[in-house]
Amino acid sequence: MKMKAMLSQPTNGKTEEEIATTRERAIATLESMGYEVVNTLLTDEWYSPDSCEARGVVNRPMMFLAKSLENMSLCHVAYFCKGWKNARGCRIEHAVAEAYGLTILYEEGDE
């Protein structure tokens, strides 16, 4: 069985290009280490503001965090991208990863 990893990546205030570049670099790093990366970037229509509102979601950031934690349950490793300490969701993901014994990796220079 291939070990699975997830990314914890700050996105607030970043352009789509910045997010994609960081994400691609992190995925390449994890794949070169032999991990299968579980997608935690939720971009399809189901997660759009209108769709969430229609379903009664009143706190989208919390919904994204909940889905991320669900995906984390599939993983052995959590990889934290630079700037994670400044992002509320990433800090929560880090605390959960520590509490539940996931292996924690950091983007170079950001422990």
Regions found by a protein language model. Give the residues of each.
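Conserved catalytic or regulatory cores that recognize and/or transform ribose-phosphate-containing ligands
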Residues: 1-111
